Each structure stands twice: as C-alpha cells, then as structure tokens.
Curated annotation (Swiss-Prot):
Residues 254-284 form a coiled coil. Its main location: nucleus. GO terms for molecular function: microtubule binding; structural constituent of cytoskeleton. Forms cell-cycle specific filaments between the spindle pole bodies of dividing yeast cells. Keywords: Coiled coil, Cytoplasm, Cytoskeleton, Nucleus, Phosphoprotein. Strong overexpression results in the accumulation of filamentous structures resembling the neurofibrillary tangles found in cells of patients with Alzheimer disease. This is Filament protein FIN1. It comes from Saccharomyces cerevisiae (strain ATCC 204508 / S288c) (Baker's yeast).
C-alpha cells in the first residue's frame, strides 16, 4: 500500500476550476510546469514599442568580466620595445617612422605622443564651401540677405554711368513728375530723384490756407459718429494758472530789458541822424537860390 501511495502523483490543489476537463497527464504539477504554454501573440503586442532597460538600471549592474582601468601599466618586458615600421596602404603619403613617435619612459606609465594626422594637414589649407548658420544670420542682419545677380548688375551700372547722364535723368524725372497726376503710377526709377523739400513747403502753405481747420472739423465729425450710442463718463477737468510774484527777477528778464533799452536808443539816434540829414539837404538847396 505504501508503494502505491508513493507512486501517486502530486496534484495541483489550487487549480480546482475545470479540473475534471483537464487530462490526467496535465494533472501532475511537475509535468505541467516542465511544459511551456503556447504563446499567443495578439496585434496589440506588435504595436507596442520595444522594451529597453533604462540607463539608471544599467549603471548599477555588475559585470561578470573584470573591467580594466583606462591606463594600464606597461609590463617591464615591453618598456624598451620599439614598434616596427608599418606602411599604410590607404594613405601612401603617410610615412611612419620611429622619429615621429616619441616614447617617454617613466617608472609607472609609458606615454606615447603621436604626430598630427596627415588628413588634417592636407584638408586644413582648403577653403570650406558654404557657411554655417551664424554667417547666414550675420549676412541677413547687415546686408539684408544675399544680393541677387540682378541687384549686383544694377549697382554696377549705377557706378559706371557718368555724372552728366545722372543729371539728365534727374531733370527728366522732375518734368515727368510735374505732368503725372498720380505718384503711385510712376516707376521707382522716376521717383528716385524727387525733392521732398518742395512737398513740405506745399504742405505748410496748404495749412496756412485753411486745410488745418478742415481736417480738424472732419476728425471731430468722425469721432462723433464713432462715439454714437456709447455711454460716456463725465470728465472733470481743471485749468490751473500759476502767477509768479513781481519781486522775482531772473537773469533772462534782465537781459531782455537791456536789449530793449539798446533798441530804443538805436531808434532815437536814427531819428536824430535823419533829422540832421534833412536839415543839411534843405541848406544845400537854399544856397543856389540866394545866388
């Protein structure tokens, strides 16, 4: 009876649901655990991104292989070793020699100083085509972008043209500007030699003729139309006048008074001189009559 009880396989007590439907060979725990279940891959698993270990986790991981330090001490047998000459097939211009490599022996570490790379020597003298982002930014800031070929031609033509031709073009442009009623219809070349002082003088004359009052009335009407239907708050305004006392006399007022006195003296002297001149003229006219 004891042998039969030992042969009896261990049963999974936890898995009670649907135990009757499971075959007898799957009922054994060891058999069930030894067999791997079928992997069913769904579409959702394909869409997921690949799982990677974060760098924080990898830092703390211990390597099974011993990692060597960055600078390894050279052994005693290789301290006086000189490497043989090697010829590079890719770079025939590079000639390796023992003179280029300087070996400095110390007690602990062998320091090897290598010469400059031959590729750096060959490509250092070549001018680089194009430019980086900083240069383009500088050009755009100070030159208003790179000049087009048409613009360069225009500048060259302007330098080549003599001064007489320029004066003739300016005269023609001025006459055409007078005849043309609309300035916007004219090309830029004709508007180039225009004098703005004439326009400013015209504006000043127009203001004197009464255009200023007309513009004021128009602006007032427009503001009234715009403000229709709006609730306005009463604006309280105060006009304050400051009067200086009479005893305060500044330097400017003194200077003005002196200038006024000088002008009055000049006018008085002018009248005296005019009266004297008139008397002399009368005397000169009366002398020939007596004769």
């Amino acid at each position: 009876m004891s042998n039969k009880s030992n042969r009896r396989s261990l049963r999974d007590i936890g898995n009670t649901i649907g135990r009757n439907n499971i075959p007898s060979d799957k009922d054994n725990v060891f058999v069930r655990l030894s067999m791997s279940p079928l992997r069913t891959t769904s579409q959702k698993e394909f869409l997921k991104p690949p799982m990677r270990i974060s760098p924080n986790k990898t830092d703390g991981m211990k390597h099974s292989i011993q990692v060597t330090p960055r600078r390894i001490m050279s052994p005693e047998c290789l301290k006086g070793y000189v490497s043989k000459e090697t010829q590079s097939l890719d770079r025939p211009q590079f000639k390796n020699s023992n003179k280029n490599v300087k070996i400095q022996n110390s007690d602990h570490i062998t320091n090897i100083i290598f010469p400059t790379s031959p590729t750096k020597l060959t490509f250092s003298n070549e001018n680089k085509i194009g430019g980086d982002g900083s240069l383009t930014r500088i050009r755009a800031r100070f030159k208003n972008g790179l000049m087009s070929p048409e613009r360069i031609q225009q500048q060259q033509q302007q330098h080549i043209l003599p001064s007489d031709a320029k004066s003739n073009t300016d005269l023609c442009s001025n006459t055409e500007l007078k005849d043309a009623p609309f300035e916007n219809d004219l090309p830029r070349a004709k508007l180039k030699g225009k004098n703005l002082l004439v326009e400013l003088k015209k504006e000043e004359e127009d203001v004197g003729n009464g255009i200023e009052s007309l513009t004021k009335s128009n602006t007032k009407l427009n503001s009234m139309l715009a403000n229709e239907g709006k609730i306005h708050k009463a604006s309280f305004q105060k006009s304050v006048k400051f009067k200086l006392p009479d005893n305060i006399v500044t330097e400017e007022t003194v200077e003005l008074k002196e200038i006024k006195d000088l002008l009055l003296q000049m006018l008085r002297r002018q009248r005296e001189i005019e009266s004297r001149l008139s008397n002399i003229e009368l005397q000169l006219t009366e002398i020939p009559k007596h004769k």
